[in-house]
Amino acid sequence: MAGISYVASFFLLLTKLSIGQREVTVQKGPLFRAEGYPVSIGCNVTGHQGPSEQHFQWSVYLPTNPTQEVQIISTKDAAFSYAVYTQRVRSGDVYVERVQGNSVLLHISKLQMKDAGEYECHTPNTDEKYYGSYSAKTNLIVIPDTLSATMSSQTLGKEEGEPLALTCEASKATAQHTHLSVTWYLTQDGGGSQATEIISLSKDFILVPGPLYTERFAASDVQLNKLGPTTFRLSIERLQSSDQGQLFCEATEWIQDPDETWMFITKKQTDQTTLRIQPAVKDFQVNITADSLFAEGKPLELVCLVVSSGRDPQLQGIWFFNGTEIAHIDAGGVLGLKNDYKERASQGELQVSKLGPKAFSLKIFSLGPEDEGAYRCVVAEVMKTRTGSWQVLQRKQSPDSHVHLRKPAARSVVMSTKNKQQVVWEGETLAFLCKAGGAESPLSVSWWHIPRDQTQPEFVAGMGQDGIVQLGASYGVPSYHGNTRLEKMDWATFQLEITFTAITDSGTYECRVSEKSRNQARDLSWTQKISVTVKSLESSLQVSLMSRQPQVMLTNTFDLSCVVRAGYSDLKVPLTVTWQFQPASSHIFHQLIRITHNGTIEWGNFLSRFQKKTKVSQSLFRSQLLVHDATEEETGVYQCEVEVYDRNSLYNNRPPRASAISHPLRIAVTLPESKLKVNSRSQVQELSINSNTDIECSILSRSNGNLQLAIIWYFSPVSTNASWLKILEMDQTNVIKTGDEFHTPQRKQKFHTEKVSQDLFQLHILNVEDSDRGKYHCAVEEWLLSTNGTWHKLGEKKSGLTELKLKPTGSKVRVSKVYWTENVTEHREVAIRCSLESVGSSATLYSVMWYWNRENSGSKLLVHLQHDGLLEYGEEGLRRHLHCYRSSSTDFVLKLHQVEMEDAGMYWCRVAEWQLHGHPSKWINQASDESQRMVLTVLPSEPTLPSRICSSAPLLYFLFICPFVLLLLLLISLLCLYWKARKLSTLRSNTRKEKALWVDLKEAGGVTTNRREDEEEDEGN
């Protein structure tokens, strides 16, 4: 209806436009509509000529192709629609409604998300000429339906006059600004009648009652409250019979179009709640119910119920026993008791109460013989008068309820273990059930334990009729193995539970049930026994250690599995697993890692890097150790230790129940097998002097993995029988080192190594000369770096030999091969000569190198007299010991100073010829030759006195120390003489003083007189 009124006003506005030029207008957009709901778009044309009834054509431009027109429907051409809309037009889902001759409405009954787009209304021209607009566009946006309305479906039974409250949840999640309206409806029984509106909250947040509920809304009998953002509650204070039927809630979502008109876009209804209303009845009946077995000592509760009364009657109840009133409760809840029962109520033996508006209760907590008889209740409906007193309107009484006490009968006792298990594992809970048969009565129970190999029972626990629990001496205090708990399941069933059992808990358990009787002097008792066994956890504990690869390649990964086998695998007991390691060089096991039963991981500190490359996984009865990047440090013996705890150990600090250690397992970490292969073919290179050459070292295959190579180049001169000399070495870290014989600047510049590719290395030799002739080869080493930073050599291969020859230059050096030998005395000088048989041209220079060799030792370069006259010593210490010079054009001399015994051996020289070559000119070694080996024998010299003295260490020490000893003795003698002379002088002086003292004493008087006279003379002067 809102859409039709909008369209009417829309077209009324458009008719007011002046007629002159054609103008087509459509509803202003954008228009937001929900998926699955209808939409109507109006189109009007004015200022047209021709017939009053104009034709309209509707098209859409979809967002996927905004420039492509998709034809929907036309009032002129039935075949106007494109294929995507043909079926919807035929089914009536899309149609055009003509409002007037120049106005239409495009209807889409059920929107789809693909219907979103820009809609165009076009009017074919009926004018004499084109003047004005012939089409107009508007945007339609299809949004998801997010409206939700829910209410639980239920059936309610109410009495007339009672209140009713129903809650409806309505929510939306639309991105656009929308309003929500909520309406409650009632459908009368039969389903064919139209729903009656009860009350609604409009989109403008205004409460609007339905036509039939206006008066009740004004009287606040019908209300609609919004409890939260999405919660709406319908409240009816006093139900009427006309309210019976099905109630439901309808939520409607509204949106405001650009022309400020509100349009609904979604609408949802909830499930229905069926309401049945019972008419109010003024009359009532009274019944009495008894809840008891009528046994002595048992409680008795009598309930007086009022049936079919009004909604809220004012009732008072009166209790009678054997026709005598014992208690009453008025309508205000005031209690009145007779004297005897007032005393029993004060002692807690009796309770009279009002359970509800229509229920009264009389409760006796412990029945006795005095309580046998007939009970009756009387209920009166009353109303309060103006004076405040209660006026009885009607009175009803219940039938009598007779109470007769039952006599105690013989009982049967059944004892069993919980879950029917008489064999449990250590640490498990042991639970016993003791059930007494017969009539309900207060019972007490006591539990006894007879350990194995004993006959005397031990008291475990007991519970009296009052529920007080007593524990035995050995069970009263929590011990190592747990606690004892006694529980009363019902009046006849008792449970004894011993948690964290130990092996000592095995044996026979006895349950004694007792019942007291007022008419008997002794209590009645019944007994039952059962035997149980507690098995040790350690008895079935087995630990095994295994590995899929006890022999591991270096840097590979290996795993160790510690498997626990026990007969109690289903108990899920906590385990502590300790991994231990004994290195190959030790006899002591060290802790690697400890996974405790409470989840804590403790790492040992024996292997520093072990934690960073180890993964530990642990399940209930299995622990796995995964070690990555194995090194030689991990070589050794492994074992695992398992400790079993009880299930409550997470909350206490009890020691383990059992433990076991696996067998030791040896893990060997070995180097991987080398797959290195080097080209072993030999070759010969013949070169011109002073040219450059390359010697290749080709690798045919290598081992897999992150391995590094070391390349070492060796050289063996042609003219000597010396061992291979190291030229250059490029180690596995790409550091280049020069051999001992190639440290000179000239040789460092001559030889260079290069890594051409991963599998090809070259030795570059610059300016080849005669001294470079010989054989060359390379040695390739494979190195593996372990995680601890240690390099390991996997293998070594040597290449084939490359022989380097020089093309003839016409020059040839010949050194005299005359055999020479000489004996020389120690500490003398000796000269060794090397002679040329012929001398070359004046442009030729010569250099000589002197070598020395001794049996069981390698050759040694002593000195090198270069072609330019410079001397280069093999060792710096030889500079003072020997001298090399050229005595003539054909003679070279090596002179040894102060020959020692160690200088004996073979000496020889190597003479090289040098000439200038190339531009710019450079001295090149063209040819060389060696002399015959010359033998030098050193004889020991004749010993002299100084030499003998120096050669004897004791004599040398004696000659050095003796003067000091004699000097010391002389000083001591002089000191003694001085001391004796001084002592003698002192004695003589003392003798003179004694004599002088006697003379002085004799002449004392005269001396005194003379002194006084002298003093007087001095004063007179």
Curated annotation (Swiss-Prot):
Classification via InterPro entries: Dihydroorotase_CS, Ig-like_dom, Ig-like_dom_sf, Ig-like_fold, Ig_sub, Ig_V-set, IgSF_V-set/TM_domain
Membrane topology: Single-pass type I membrane protein
Source domain of life: Eukaryota
GO molecular function, one term: hydrolase activity, acting on carbon-nitrogen (but not peptide) bonds, in cyclic amides
Keywords tagged on the record: Disulfide bond, Glycoprotein, Immunoglobulin domain, Membrane, Repeat, Signal, Transmembrane, Transmembrane helix
CDD domains (UniProt xref): IgV (cd00099)
Gene Ontology, cellular component aspect: extracellular exosome; membrane; plasma membrane
Annotated compartments: Membrane
Cystines in this chain: C43-C121, C168-C249, C304-C377, C434-C511, C562-C640, C697-C778, C834-C909
Motif (EWI motif): 253-255
SMART domains: IG, IGv
Coiled coil: none
PROSITE patterns: IG_LIKE
Extracellular side: 21-954
Domain Ig-like C2-type span(s) in chain numbering: 22-139, 144-265, 279-389, 408-525, 541-651, 656-794, 808-925
Segments on the Cytoplasmic face: 976-1021
Pfam families: V-set
PTM: N-glycosylated.
Glycosylated residues in this chain: N44, N322
Signal peptide: 1-20
Tissue: Expressed in lung, thymus and small intestine. Detected in cutaneous dendritic cells, activated T-cells, monocytes and granulocytes as well as with epithelial cells with dendritic morphology. Expressed in some leukemic cells, the CD4(+) CD56(+) blastic tumor cells, as well as in Langerhans cells from LCH (Langerhans cell histiocytosis) patients.
Annotated transmembrane regions: 955-975
Function: Plays a role as inhibitor of T-cells proliferation induced by CD3. Inhibits expression of IL2RA on activated T-cells and secretion of IL2. Inhibits tyrosine kinases that are required for IL2 production and cellular proliferation. Inhibits phospholipase C-gamma-1/PLCG1 phosphorylation and subsequent CD3-induced changes in intracellular free calcium. Prevents nuclear translocation of nuclear factor of activated T-cell to the nucleus. Plays a role in the inhibition of T-cell proliferation via IL10 secretion by cutaneous dendritic cells. May be a marker of CD4(+) CD56(+) leukemic tumor cells.
Record-given protein name: Immunoglobulin superfamily member 2
Lineage start: Eukaryota, Metazoa, Chordata, Craniata, Vertebrata
